[in-house]
């Protein structure tokens, strides 16, 4: 124990050894002293430990309506999909809290299948759900997976991504969310079972079955293929929520045929031919997924099916401006840091939305379009201190014209509006 330094007559911290002159405060106990820096360090350690314990528990899971309200802050439209997701997620974590059994009734897991076109918000919905619940989240691409023993990734590597997202806290990872994208790409090549091996299609579905349902999986800590001379991380997937998303191009034709077969008959109207793609997707059933190429066992482990609509121009404009992390808000903030006000005219927003629709990229393509428009602006503006405002017009987006600039002396420059 450190007490008095006989030469200098000073007290020292019993933990770090610093003298009372080197710290702001020294607290005395029975024959022991601790400085304010060590107290702060101990507090952080305790808070971190307690915080980790609290995050693993899900005693206050938001109600479905609360989940949908928070989703509305980040994701525009897709109301039916939000409602389906909110109920499924609430029931999933309610099941975890009840230890999966209520009065000897076993509650099964509600994994989710998201069906919708590219850029409709499938990944964003899954990410936002994980953020709401404060659980680890991982994204995997189904196209990179192959059956064990073939070139490609093992399905266990999906679990490794989740463990890494949880900072290797396995208990925390066991209550996380995994989003598997492009799940439609692992559909088998034909509806009838093949005698040839389909290692990146049906083989992947077979490999995913166990982890979707719930099993104790052995995960290589460094990823890659398993070999017998390495240690494994054991993780129970029973309480991991799996969300599988895909565009399922062509499934609307399968739905249309099913609906058409049911309405064809004497004196009946074939309404299926008149239904829009979005309306058809909302009528998807497990039997349609079976005809598309998913195996029955795989479909059975994804009991919740939610369909997303193609985003129209109005929805894309709202995505640009309304969410908390809207792209327009982000770019305005970036220019604000250079003391320049940024404005997007309504016509400019409409033109950006039209370009995204033309490219068939949905909301996913909005950022690259704005980045192209803003490149010269963000390159030149930091070097100029005479600009007060930058206005992105419809002509800037549609025709590539320079944006309108308002100088600090009131002069307006650009697009035939030069004035003093």
UniProtKB/Swiss-Prot annotation:
Signal peptide boundaries: none
GO cellular component term of the entry, any: HslUV protease complex
Binding site for Zn(2+): 13, 16, 35, 38
UniProt cross-references to InterPro entries, sorted A to Z: AAA+_ATPase, ATP-dep_Clp_protease_ClpX, ATPase_AAA_core, Clp_ATPase_C, Clp_protease_ATP-bd_su_ClpX, ClpX_bact, P-loop_NTPase, Znf_CppX_C4
Top-level taxon: Bacteria
Subunit structure of this chain's protein: Component of the ClpX-ClpP complex. Forms a hexameric ring that, in the presence of ATP, binds to fourteen ClpP subunits assembled into a disk-like structure with a central cavity, resembling the structure of eukaryotic proteasomes.
Record's protein name: ATP-dependent Clp protease ATP-binding subunit ClpX
Gene: clpX
